Curated annotation (Swiss-Prot):
It comes from Caenorhabditis elegans. GO terms for cellular component: mitochondrion. The lineage of its organism: Eukaryota, Metazoa, Ecdysozoa, Nematoda, Chromadorea. Disruption phenotype: RNAi-mediated knockdown extends mean lifespan by 25% and maximum lifespan by 19%, increases maximum moving speed, and increases levels of the enzyme substrates, L-leucine, L-isoleucine and L-valine. It is found in: Cytoplasm. This is Branched-chain-amino-acid aminotransferase, cytosolic. Catalyzes the first reaction in the catabolism of the essential branched chain amino acids leucine, isoleucine, and valine. InterPro entries: Aminotrans_IV, Aminotrans_IV_CS, Aminotransferase-like, B_amino_transII, BCAT-like_C, BCAT-like_N, BCAT_family. Belongs to the class-IV pyridoxal-phosphate-dependent aminotransferase family. Its EC number is 2.6.1.42. The keyword Amino-acid biosynthesis applies.
Length: 415
């Protein structure tokens, strides 16, 4: 059976099988029967097809001397991953190349109809100097669900994780040697076909950029104040609040400015006549209290209504809380009236957000707009003075897992 030949350019590497092979003037061969048997580019791109263009000396950037002082999202590493898709051919070969600008037509779907989704994940340099990703399978599963909802192309999670691993190997010097810093990864999928009119994208681009990020709390935990006003809604049943799409974030910016004008750092998103709690800022929300039955309980809103992004950190905290067995762990709807009642009865001990950026974020105050009186009420949350230390234990444990001080089976992926 004849072989299919593929030539790659000088200073480019091609992945066939499991490792890099130099290809300055080299032909790689893959048996045609293997292609027919295993390749289906309508379904996914493949790690084995990965092409890597190495950066020249002038393209490599100076790394920050003190990563703890980095501002989130302002510094990028040397490389990025890209992979194109079109409806006729399916996925093209994935590529890793020096980071640079994308060329996109002004009529691209993403620019007009927000045909887009993204993920946020991190890689950590452990105390043993090994680099690991935190639960990447969960990020990829969520990204695939979002792609389906956005009518963008599907892909295989393991193929994507393997490509991310190669990207991290090239950018490994950008992973800070610090137990409070990390390398942030932003996988993104956009519709790119240059046609106006609402409809399914016939062309798309996957890309991944990375960058080092400092400690979220450089001087220790800083409790945040929340604006809670049910006149502003983040998500609704049947919508896309449970998916990581850019269209969920842009409409929240103005509300965030309103919160800042009232000396609040985040928004506590409420929903419905009962003012159900959903999210805090871009984080999931947790409460630790004594419930009305007298049980100590960790509680967070449920996912079933589609109002809440299923956070990786959220899932991790729930799993740890249930493993510890020190209190009841519950996912159920809760509303502002319950919060106010628990505060008045002094049985609400801690409230905190959870997310990739910070692990946990303590809440110190809620500025609540009372829709009956049309006045604002200040509700003080005793998170920082809590004797139970539930939030702190979560932070310490997740941090220890991420940096390799604690081994948690299946949670960290070595690169």
């Amino acid at each position: 059976m004849p072989a299919i030949l593929s030539r790659v350019a000088p200073r480019t590497f091609n992945l066939v099988g499991s490792r890099l092979m130099a290809s300055a003037a080299r032909l790689e061969t893959v048996p045609r029967e293997e292609i027919h048997k295993e390749y289906d580019r309508k379904k996914t791109f493949y790690h084995r097809d990965l092409e890597i263009q190495l950066a020249g000396p002038t393209q490599l950037k100076t790394k920050p001397l003190d990563p703890t002082k980095l501002k989130f999202g302002h510094t990028y590493a040397d490389y990025m991953m890209t992979c194109d898709w079109d409806a006729e051919r399916g996925w093209h070969h994935p590529k890793i190349e020096p980071i640079g600008e994308l060329k996109i037509h002004p009529g691209a779907k993403v620019l007009h109809y927000a045909s887009e989704l993204f993920e946020g994940m991190k890689a950590y340099r452990g105390i043993d100097n090994k680099i690991r990703m935190f639960r990447p399978e969960m990020n990829m599963a969520r990204m695939k669900r979002t792609a389906l909802r956005a009518a963008l192309p599907d892909f295989d999670s393991e193929e994507m994780i393997n490509v991310l691993t190669e990207l991290l190997r090239l950018d490994q010097e950008w992973v800070p040697n610090s137990d409070v810093c990390s390398l942030y990864l932003r996988p993104t999928l956009i519709g790119t076909d240059p046609t106006l009119g609402v409809g399914c994208a016939t062309e798309a681009k996957m890309f991944v950029i990375t960058g080092p990020v400092g400690a979220y709390y450089s001087t220790g935990f800083q409790p945040v104040s929340l604006l809670a006003d049910s006149r502003f809604i983040r998500a609704f049943p049947g919508g896309v609040g449970a998916y990581k799409m850019g269209c969920n974030y842009a409409p929240t910016i103005w509300v965030g400015k309103e919160a800042a004008s009232k000396n609040c750092q985040q928004v506590l998103w409420l929903y419905g006549e009962n003012e159900d709690l959903t999210e805090v800022g871009t984080m999931n929300i947790f409460l630790f209290w004594k419930n009305e039955e007298g049980d100590m309980e960790l509680i967070t809103p449920p996912l079933h209504r589609g109002l809440i992004l299923p956070g990786v950190t959220r899932d991790s905290l729930l799993e740890l809380g249930r493993e510890w067995g020190e209190y009841k762990v519950t996912e159920r709807t809760l509303n502002m009236e319950e919060v106010k009642k628990a505060l008045s009865e002094k049985r609400l001990y801690e409230m905190f957000g959870s997310g990739t950026a910070c692990v946990v974020s303590p809440v110190g105050k809620i500025l609540y707009h009372n829709k009956v009186t049309d006045e604002y009420e200040e509700l003080h949350i005793p998170t920082m003075s809590s004797k139970f230390g539930v939030m702190q234990k979560f932070y310490n444990t997740i941090n220890d897992i991420q940096y390799g001080r604690i081994i948690k089976d299946g949670w960290m992926r070595d690169i």
